[in-house]
Swiss-Prot record:
Record's protein name: Large ribosomal subunit protein uL24
InterPro entries membership: KOW, Rib_uL2_dom2, Ribosomal_uL24, Ribosomal_uL24_CS, Ribosomal_uL24_KOW, Translation_prot_SH3-like_sf
UniProt source species: Borrelia garinii subsp. bavariensis (strain ATCC BAA-2496 / DSM 23469 / PBi) (Borreliella bavariensis)
A Pfam entry, by short name: KOW
GO cellular component, one term: ribonucleoprotein complex
UniProt GO MF annotations: rRNA binding; structural constituent of ribosome
Entry keyword set: Ribonucleoprotein, Ribosomal protein, RNA-binding, rRNA-binding
Keyword Ribonucleoprotein listed: yes
Function: One of two assembly initiator proteins, it binds directly to the 5'-end of the 23S rRNA, where it nucleates assembly of the 50S subunit. One of the proteins that surrounds the polypeptide exit tunnel on the outside of the subunit.
Amino acid sequence: MKTKLKIGDSVKILSGKDKGRIGKIASINRKKNKVIVESCNMVKKVIKARTPQEKGKIIDKEAAIDISNVIIFIKGTSSRLGIRFENNEKIRYLKKNGQRI
């Protein structure tokens, strides 16, 4: 699936346990159609001890969210993204109100 989202974009989560939360995209996996949003969809991960002297630990980590479950969020407005050309330059804009990004 082709996406117009980029790393660092502010997005709103549309479904799941963090529905309605807003965060920035930390990474995008285009092959699996997943995004990781900072401080959202946190899961606990168990890290095993590597040596007998070292202890195992439990850490909180962001889990991937399907790209269809997020939408771009700018200045209180969430909308789909569009692309148009102005002066031979690709411009991303909000389809709801035409605002440039």
